[in-house]
Amino acid sequence: MGLAGTKVKQRFGLDPRNTNWSNDTSRFGHQYLERMGWKPGKGLGLVEHATTSHVKVSIKDDNLGLGSKLAKKQKTDEFDSGECSGLDVFQRILGRLNGKEDQINKEIERKRKDNIINGKWGIQFIKGEVLQSTWDKEAKKLLDKGTTKKRKIDSVDSSEESTTSSDSKQHKKKKIKKDRKEKEEKKTEKENSEIKKKKKEKKEKKEKKEKKDKNEKKEKKDKNEKKEKKDKNEEKEKKEKKEKKEKKDKKDKKDKKDKKEKKEVKEVTRDSMLMPKEQLNQQIATRLSVRSKWIKQKRASVMDAKALNEIFMVTS
């Protein structure tokens, strides 16, 4: 590429292999495991010969199943050719020569079906099996190294005794199965009773809650109704008071008006006309003084009863 190529800088840290944390014995986890009896180089399971190295995380860049790469490295069966092609045909020829043609054909057919299924779903299924040497079928537990060795030695001696004790073993197995079944039934009954109890309690709680909510709603409704009724009554009383006040004000105004009118207007009769009236203190303007004088004279003549009698020629 030369100078025109892209520059790639590599930076190496203080711990490129990331081993400081594993070598550090002052960590809490390391100290805690040592207190429990663990030592560096030992496994963490029941089996001592398990993996003791650190687990490394690798990026998965394909759609294969878990463990498919390991299966390619290690042959799963005698017909697993890996990357070699045409080995199954060679195995057929060898099978015909050895007289195991049927067995080999079955194995090849099974392998062909597995390949078809794996190609269809895009997943490679790996069948897991348990080693017979580390697993006790009767007790269903992992065996230690000592017990496995003893079993191997005793298996030769106890081959003759196995025939006689087969009946007793079957009886024991039946008894164990029966006890297990009874335990499971008891467990299921207990679980069912607990579930029923929980359901009942839940139902009761729900009913109580619903009842409480109903009562609260009813009380709230009653309070609202009472409040509305009270507000309506208060409004009605206020309205009535207002109307009464308005009526009273109107009546008072009317009475005042009537009194005023009565004061101002009096009935005009013959006697009232003949009777002398009080002189009014009326301020008259200067320009109307002549007219007012003439009006006063005329009024004076009307007020005088004697003068009127003379005018109308009435003899008393």
From Swiss-Prot:
What biological process terms from GO does the record include? box C/D sno(s)RNA 3'-end processing; negative regulation of telomere maintenance via telomerase; rRNA processing
UniProt superkingdom: Eukaryota
Q: Which SMART domains match?
A: G_patch
Kindly state one GO CC term assigned in the UniProt record: nucleoplasm
Start-end of Basic and acidic residues biased regions:
179-195, 210-240, 261-270
What Pfam families does the annotation carry? G-patch
Main subcellular location: nucleus
UniProt entry keywords in alphabetical sequence: Nucleus, Ribosome biogenesis, rRNA processing
| Spans annotated as Disordered | 146-280
**Which PROSITE patterns does the UniProt entry name for this protein?**
G_PATCH (PS50174)
Where's the G-patch domain? 25-71
Q: What GO MF terms are annotated?
A: enzyme activator activity; nucleic acid binding; telomerase inhibitor activity
Location comes to: Nucleus, Nucleolus
Q: Which family does it belong to?
A: Belongs to the PINX1 family.
Protein name as it appears in the record: Protein PXR1
Organism of provenance: Debaryomyces hansenii (strain ATCC 36239 / CBS 767 / BCRC 21394 / JCM 1990 / NBRC 0083 / IGC 2968)
**Which gene holds the coding sequence for this protein?**
PXR1
